[in-house]
Amino acid sequence: MGRLLCLCSLVVVLLAPACAPEAAATDPIARGRQVYRELGCANCHEASLSNFFRPVGPPLNEIGRIAPKRVPGLSAEDYLRQSITDPGAYVVPGYPDSMPRGLARDLSTADLAALVAYLASLR
């Protein structure tokens, strides 16, 4: 019984950090990755069982490379920022205009900049 209690205690101690809320990252790209996860962006932009392996929104795994080519005259960062703040301004062909409106309203200026930096880093 003592060994079992000791083993259970060890498991709790080892798993506790994994269950704790993630501390806010200070690196903009790391913080952007955190914001991406917190907002649930992967639910629509990554293939999964829930969306039958085809993302609802365009995949973002190489968006940093693709973004500068999407809208002539917009840098990758400007395109990404516009896609978050005004999602209907440009809709990727083959995908519905389903990006949530008002998403940027819920983001601080720093979190929006971090999210843009993270997305721009995906190549």
Regions found by a protein language model. Name each.
Residues 20-27:
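Bacterial lipoprotein signal-peptidase II cleavage site
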Residues 1-8:
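Bacterial N-terminal signal peptides that target proteins for export
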Residues 53, 92-94:
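Short, hydrophobic secondary-structure boundary micro-motifs
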Residues 41, 88-92:
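Generic structural signal for secondary-structure transition and capping sites
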Residues 15-18:
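C-terminal motif of bacterial Sec signal peptides marking the signal peptidase cleavage site
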Residues 29, 33, 46-85, 100-105:
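Gly/Gly-Pro-rich "capping" loops immediately C-terminal to redox-active cysteine motifs
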